Amino acid sequence: MRMADHFEETTMGTFLADYYLWTKSLHVISVLAWMAGLFYLPRLFVYHAEVVKAGTETDALFQTMERRLLRAIMNPAMIATWIFGLLLVFTPGIVDWSMLWPWTKAACVLAMTGFHMWLAARRRDFAAGANRHKGRTYRMMNELPTLLMLVIVFSAVAKWNYWGF
């Protein structure tokens, strides 16, 4: 008996299958919250880098907004996205790892998580008064989550099995 077959027969496999639509809904909600933060934080960095002088009252305001966005919205949303996503992966019959789509989605989710970590490091730079990037860098980096999102959505919805779609 394959391990996957055994998992499908377990109580956990049955539980995940029974609550699949709830898990999927919570996954989509957390992804939306995470993506909102991934789109907004680089925008804050653009204005922080281009307009705000370090050590000013406005600098402190931007640092507060950036910290709260990251800690209160983005971090919990990323964690929830991962938890609900992994629950979906372990739901029997949902992911066929012999196809291409779960691998492209997984690679892009890892890249999105890496981008999140990069943003967290840049927030620490601003907090230390040590930002070394121009607004243009943050403007360009702001496009990365959009590109990753496109690949993730097409992977998860179209479930392609080869690069010719």
UniProtKB/Swiss-Prot annotation:
Give the subcellular location.
Cell membrane
**Keywords carried by this UniProt record:** Cell membrane, Heme, Iron, Membrane, Metal-binding, Oxidoreductase, Transmembrane, Transmembrane helix
**Chain residues that bind heme:** H27, K105
Q: What class of enzyme is it?
A: oxidoreductase
Sorted alphabetically, the Gene Ontology cellular component annotations on this record are:
plasma membrane
Where does the chain cross the membrane?
26-46, 77-97, 99-119, 145-165
Q: What is its main location?
A: membrane
| Metabolic or biological pathway | Porphyrin-containing compound metabolism; protoporphyrin-IX biosynthesis; protoporphyrin-IX from protoporphyrinogen-IX: step 1/1
According to its UniProt record, which cofactors does this protein need? heme b
Which EC number(s) does UniProt give?
Answer: 1.3.99.-
Query: ATP-binding among the record's keywords?
Result: no
How does the protein's chain sit in the membrane according to the entry?
Answer: Multi-pass membrane protein
Which BP terms does GO give this entry? protoporphyrinogen IX biosynthetic process
Known catalytic reactions: protoporphyrinogen IX + 3 A = protoporphyrin IX + 3 AH2
The UniProt similarity line reads: Belongs to the HemJ family.
Task of the protein: Catalyzes the oxidation of protoporphyrinogen IX to protoporphyrin IX. Is involved in the biosynthesis of tetrapyrrole molecules like heme and chlorophyll. Does not use oxygen or artificial electron acceptors such as menadione or benzoquinone.
Q: Enumerate the PANTHER family for this protein.
A: PROTOPORPHYRINOGEN IX OXIDASE (PTHR40255:SF1), UPF0093 MEMBRANE PROTEIN SLR1790 (PTHR40255)
Q: How does it assemble?
A: Homodimer.
Q: What protein is this chain from?
A: Protoporphyrinogen IX oxidase
